[in-house]
Amino acid sequence: MAGNTLGQLFRVTTFGESHGLALGCIVDGVPPGIPLTEADLQHDLDRRRPGTSRYTTQRREPDQVKILSGVFEGVTTGTSIGLLIENTDQRSQDYSAIKDVFRPGHADYTYEQKYGLRDYRGGGRSSARETAMRVAAGAIAKKYLAEKHGIVIQGCLTQMGDIPLEIKDWQQVEQNPFFCPDPDKIDALDELMRALKKEGDSIGAKVTVVANGVPAGLGEPVFDRLDADIAHALMSINAVKGVEIGDGFDVVALRGSQNRDEITKEGFLSNHAGGILGGISSGQQIVAHMALKPTSSITVPGRTINRFGEEVEMITKGRHDPCVGIRAVPIAEAMLAIVLMDHLLRQRAQNADVKTDIPRW
């Protein structure tokens, strides 16, 4: 199975399955001398981990990360960093009924078509459980970006179902279980989630992630454009079906005179481009959005087939998120951090001596 690695100079390779013994990853490219402890990684893992509220799956995994290598006396050595999280709350018996049945909307059918077999326990490698290691690796990148370059990455929920959420207060995001920046909408989200649980159904969501303090010049035209790599990283997250950079699809309704981000000696007058022009960061805030589909793991009966081609009715058992967008917020932050750190290292490697007299804001 290929496709388990992201990045060129900052490289993250993950391994493990939902109901296997453990999840792990190898992080290459971390510069030496960076202070790093397991506690530095645990905060974001706790934000992502299951069982933290009544609105998410009740699978209770502590997600305690272990640093196996690459750190000595509290600082990175410049060698590969090995990370491990043990699985402790698997209930594989919940999935015995789907051993020969393809859950509609899941990767069961496509994995079996590709490999001729599949790990049906919680989806195996296709499960979003794998993203725990992305968050751990992303926490390393976030720490490096913040401490060495002053880059701060934040994410939040900006829509659930037909409830749009305004980014009114970033401080509110960590104060509620929805990662919601709009305190006026929390009651509506709670009501929607209660209704979904009662119905046994699920709902989609939109997540926004931003990066402040990114310098101008990151991105490698033409095939490794910064926006292309961000979209690639975000699209690799489970359940993501669309990614927008800046105004995204809204630019269709704009005229060129409206959409262009005009420049004065004080700086840019707008940021429709989301901080990226020609695939290269402009020094403005980087803005990305991703759309997540409603999970197909629901108790509403649905039609499917088994591996023998027979039609059957499917009701998904197990412990699942009514809205996967909630726990996707720290995952989106991690993926953006991984991409930005990779491009920072690439920029330093090729263009460290480049100086310009052009203003930077």
Swiss-Prot record:
Domain of life: Bacteria
GO MF terms held by the record: chorismate synthase activity; FMN binding
EC class name: lyase
Cofactor(s) it depends on: FMNH2
GO cellular component, one term: cytosol
Binding site for NADP(+): R48, R54
Keywords associated with the record: Amino-acid biosynthesis, Aromatic amino acid biosynthesis, FAD, Flavoprotein, FMN, Lyase, NADP
Pathway(s) where this gene product acts: Metabolic intermediate biosynthesis; chorismate biosynthesis; chorismate from D-erythrose 4-phosphate and phosphoenolpyruvate: step 7/7
InterPro entries from the UniProt entry: Chorismate_synth, Chorismate_synth_AroC_sf, Chorismate_synthase_CS
GO biological process: amino acid biosynthetic process; aromatic amino acid family biosynthetic process; chorismate biosynthetic process
Any Pfam family matching the protein: Chorismate_synt
Protein residues bound to FMN: R125, S126, S127, N238, A239, G278, K293, P294, T295, S296, S297, R319
Keyword hit for Flavoprotein: yes
Catalytic activity: 5-O-(1-carboxyvinyl)-3-phosphoshikimate = chorismate + phosphate
Assembly and binders: Homotetramer.
Family named by the database record: Belongs to the chorismate synthase family.
Stated role: This reaction introduces a second double bond into the aromatic ring system.
Protein name: Chorismate synthase
Organism annotation: Citrobacter koseri (strain ATCC BAA-895 / CDC 4225-83 / SGSC4696)
Lineage summary: Bacteria, Pseudomonadati, Pseudomonadota, Gammaproteobacteria, Enterobacterales
Gene name for this UniProt entry: aroC
